[in-house]
Amino acid sequence: MKRVAMKIAYLGSGFSGSQAQPGLRTVESQVLEDIGKVLQTDDPGLSFSSRTDKGVNALGNAIAFDSSMDDLLVLAKALNSVSDGVFYRSFCEIDDEFNIRYASRRIYRYVLDGEGIDIDKASECCRLFEGEHDFFRFCRYDGKPTTLRIDSISCIPSGDCVVLEFNARYYLWNMIRRISSAVEAVGKGKRSLDDVQAALNGKDVSFGVGRPDALTLQDVQYDMLNFT
């Protein structure tokens, strides 16, 4: 028996989020079904690096589980052959005590409709969020500490769209979608940079929540793991 980490991809439209929920099709329930078919086990010790809400996509979420199969390439191919909507992209063996949730960084991309967006203003808004802040006004509060650090947010024109790329170790619930909505509002002149700064300072200013299908978890990275 060995402990395995894998990167997985999925379209959020096919699932009611990543976390298991009774009576609903989720990414976790699909992965458990896939592993059960291939490895003939009901309890593979499955854990996820990151949770994604209903509608949110992933290109590189990470999971960990126990495997009785030694050849990980064969395992990944077998999982892909039975899965309905989850794609097993890369893998590596990990120590039993390794916690897949302790990632070095998580990279997300949010795609905005570029029509009417002033890129310079949107980029300046992105810079306001970089560094360490209390993001209480930019999350759905669930009791966790709300002060954290965003390493960078890049504002990238791409055809008719504007892509916001987020780089941080972790995020709060709904945080990226709320920040993206704020950046869009500033870029389109509906809100000011002062409004954003006021919210970061604790003032009750709402910018709404961006739609989930525009958000993709691009990658989860670990300093000590090499996926193949």
Residue ranges and their predicted role:
Residues 1-228:
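Structured-RNA-binding interfaces characteristic of tRNA pseudouridine synthases
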